[in-house]
Amino acid sequence: MKCPFCGHSNTQVLDTRMSEDGDAVRRRRRCEACDRRFTTYERIELFFPAIVKKNGSRVDYSRAKLKDSMRLALRKRPVSAEAIDEAITRIEEKLLALGQKEIPSSQVGELVMRELRKLDKIAYIRFASVYRSFEDVAEFSDVLAEVTSGNSKR
């Protein structure tokens, strides 16, 4: 491992541990040339599928973008940041389990809607109204009826 301070290529590992959340190996290192210490983290690199938008363009998957859209739907709702992160992790696990290089944005939207429905019905309706581009009040009423009756058409 190259020293970030002097660029020397020989470093000694002083300590190795799992990170608190268990998703990385934390290593404390010392440079043999300048004697400075630094920490490195070793993580598994995951490759998410590219997202194919409705217009046919492709964009890289973005956890931040997904989180922003869920936060917007959950704005001023009693849902913790931890619950949002857990929902996003479940969505990501499903995306990785598909094993595909590309997936349509509509499929991601449906996964988001399922998770929002579990978290908060109001947020689900907010997201659905934008995501499904309701044309009239009848479509909105259908989703409201679906949520209040506890049935799911999708």
Swiss-Prot record:
<protein>
    <recommendedName>
        <fullName>Transcriptional repressor NrdR</fullName>
    </recommendedName>
</protein>
<feature type="zinc finger region">
    <location>
        <begin position="3"/>
        <end position="34"/>
    </location>
</feature>
<keyword id="KW-0479">Metal-binding</keyword>
<keyword id="KW-0863">Zinc-finger</keyword>
<keyword id="KW-0862">Zinc</keyword>
<dbReference type="InterPro" id="IPR055173">
    <property type="entry name" value="NrdR-like_N"/>
</dbReference>
<dbReference type="GO" id="GO:0003677">
    <property type="term" value="F:DNA binding"/>
</dbReference>
<dbReference type="Pfam" id="PF03477">
    <property type="entry name" value="ATP-cone"/>
</dbReference>
<dbReference type="InterPro" id="IPR003796">
    <property type="entry name" value="RNR_NrdR-like"/>
</dbReference>
<keyword id="KW-0238">DNA-binding</keyword>
<dbReference type="InterPro" id="IPR005144">
    <property type="entry name" value="ATP-cone_dom"/>
</dbReference>
<dbReference type="GO" id="GO:0045892">
    <property type="term" value="P:negative regulation of DNA-templated transcription"/>
</dbReference>
<keyword id="KW-0804">Transcription</keyword>
<keyword id="KW-0547">Nucleotide-binding</keyword>
<keyword id="KW-0067">ATP-binding</keyword>
<keyword id="KW-0805">Transcription regulation</keyword>
<feature type="domain" description="ATP-cone">
    <location>
        <begin position="49"/>
        <end position="139"/>
    </location>
</feature>
<dbReference type="GO" id="GO:0005524">
    <property type="term" value="F:ATP binding"/>
</dbReference>
<dbReference type="Pfam" id="PF22811">
    <property type="entry name" value="Zn_ribbon_NrdR"/>
</dbReference>
<comment type="function">
    <text>Negatively regulates transcription of bacterial ribonucleotide reductase nrd genes and operons by binding to NrdR-boxes.</text>
</comment>
<dbReference type="GO" id="GO:0008270">
    <property type="term" value="F:zinc ion binding"/>
</dbReference>
<keyword id="KW-0678">Repressor</keyword>
<comment type="similarity">
    <text>Belongs to the NrdR family.</text>
</comment>
